[in-house]
Amino acid sequence: SVPTAITTSFNALIPIVLTLLGVSVGGYAFRQISGQYLTDWIYTTIQHPLENAFQSPAGLFIIILVCRAFWFLGIHGDLIIKPVRDPFLAAALAANVAAVAAGQTPSSPITYGFWVAFVVLPVSLPVCLAIFLVSKREDYRAVAKVAIGPALFGISEPMVFGLPLVLNTTMLIPSILSVMLCSGTALFASTIGFMPCNTVDVAFGTPVLLSALIGHGWQGVVVQIIGLALATLVYIPFMIIANKQAEAEQAAQN
């Protein structure tokens, strides 16, 4: 009898061959009918418009909203959107590099370096700063003391799950608005020409200020500081609300 391992291998070949055959025949037929390759049509009709939409404020805010919604539910939002997000970020960076190589000005602001500096870092760092400024809750301040170190490197899990921000309806609105405000400020700065578009791949975990400096020069540092300050201001009223909630809970227990 044929060994099971060999049988399994050949069984796996059947769907592979059928898939390749179907795509090949379909692509050939499309080429004969339309005069262009299927992959080219997909790029010009679907991918390129989506790339343009992703570089717009609406596209940026929609994907941030989806990401933050998953985080609110306790699901790692960045990992969920990563398969959809990263190809567009990589394409934008490649377009910027190609523009520089051709002696042109890069025009795609939203790259992975942009995401690291102006979307990832505003998640938990402004929360820590707002807590240190106005929060009277000992539990919040204890979490902030632990989370501030990782937050400087864009690691938000200690704050997200420690405070927690998960299922925290009081902090839901600022957790979305703060990121949108910081990233929107950066996008505006790029649009008006103050902050150059990123042409360097900035790795996740690059600390605050350095991430902006590597990706966007000194202008990026200025924009990041402004964005983080605005994001912190967004959190302050909600921290005051959290103070009152804690006082009410303590009064009810007494």
Regions found by a protein language model. Give the residues of each.
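Interfacial/capping segments of alpha-helical transmembrane domains
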Residues: 31-49, 76-89, 192-200
